[in-house]
């Protein structure tokens, strides 16, 4: 086999060292890190901040007061209302040039701080799961033997494990997209409230998406915990076939 492809010995030693490091890290992740992390997330789910039953407690002040209605008279110093109003608006437009923006009378409109605090705790957990799954996936892939006829039952278990790890990675990445969509959707609604402060439905919609995001964040944490449980259980149950997919494994591994 060595005669078919010439490999630099120094490079080969570095690759072998990399394989050994990945193997050591992955086995430690499955044996120790996964069970510790699932217990940690299970404890996190029991914290008071994630067990609010009255969702009105997570509502935030919009900080956008409803302005007083404008009273228009039929005449003003000999000018009728519409003409005078138009003249005043024309004068203002001439005095102030540039891009028009909505004015926030009470300063910057902040995000829902309670949800932001939860999100800032959840995002590192999502990233951590993606990174650890990637390491374990690489380990299992490196254990897959070369393709040949014979008993490939163990190989199919390896491939199913890799597929499950890849699915977990994709689902975890989708959680990050979900968080981004929440911020974008809320920002658009707040802009609508600034433009149409008298429309109550916009204000109610903001509280609705805040409540929905709170429920979604709790579900995300629950899913992260469950994924650690599932991966730990699946790999431990099939560890023999994952590490030795064939009886003649010593001769068929790369």
Swiss-Prot record:
Keywords: Acetylation, Apoptosis, Cell cycle, Cytoplasm, Nucleus, Phosphoprotein, Proteasome. SUPFAM superfamilies: Proteasome activator. It is found in: Nucleus; Cytoplasm. The modification Phosphoserine is found at residues 17, 24, 247. One of its GO terms (molecular function) is endopeptidase activator activity. Its main location: nucleus. GO terms for biological process: apoptotic process; negative regulation of extrinsic apoptotic signaling pathway; regulation of G1/S transition of mitotic cell cycle; regulation of proteasomal protein catabolic process. GO terms for cellular component: cytoplasm; nucleoplasm; proteasome activator complex. The modification N-acetylalanine is found at residue 2. Phosphorylated by MAP3K3. Phosphorylation at Ser-247 promotes its association with CCAR2. It holds the Pfam family PA28_C. The modification N6-acetyllysine is found at residue 195. The keyword ATP-binding does not apply. Subunit of the 11S REG-gamma (also called PA28-gamma) proteasome regulator, a doughnut-shaped homoheptamer which associates with the proteasome. 11S REG-gamma activates the trypsin-like catalytic subunit of the proteasome but inhibits the chymotrypsin-like and postglutamyl-preferring (PGPH) subunits. Facilitates the MDM2-p53/TP53 interaction which promotes ubiquitination- and MDM2-dependent proteasomal degradation of p53/TP53, limiting its accumulation and resulting in inhibited apoptosis after DNA damage. May also be involved in cell cycle regulation. The C-terminal sequences affect heptamer stability and proteasome affinity. Homoheptamer; the stability of the heptamer is essential for the specific activation of the trypsine-like subunit and inhibition of the chymotrypsin-like and postglutamyl-preferring (PGPH) subunits of the proteasome. Interacts with p53/TP53, MDM2 and MAP3K3. Associates with the proteasome. Interacts with CCAR2. Interacts with PSME3IP1 (via C-terminus); the interaction is direct and promotes the association of PSME3 with the 20S proteasome. Interacts with COIL; the interaction is inhibited by PSME3IP1. Belongs to the PA28 family. This is Proteasome activator complex subunit 3. It comes from Pongo abelii.
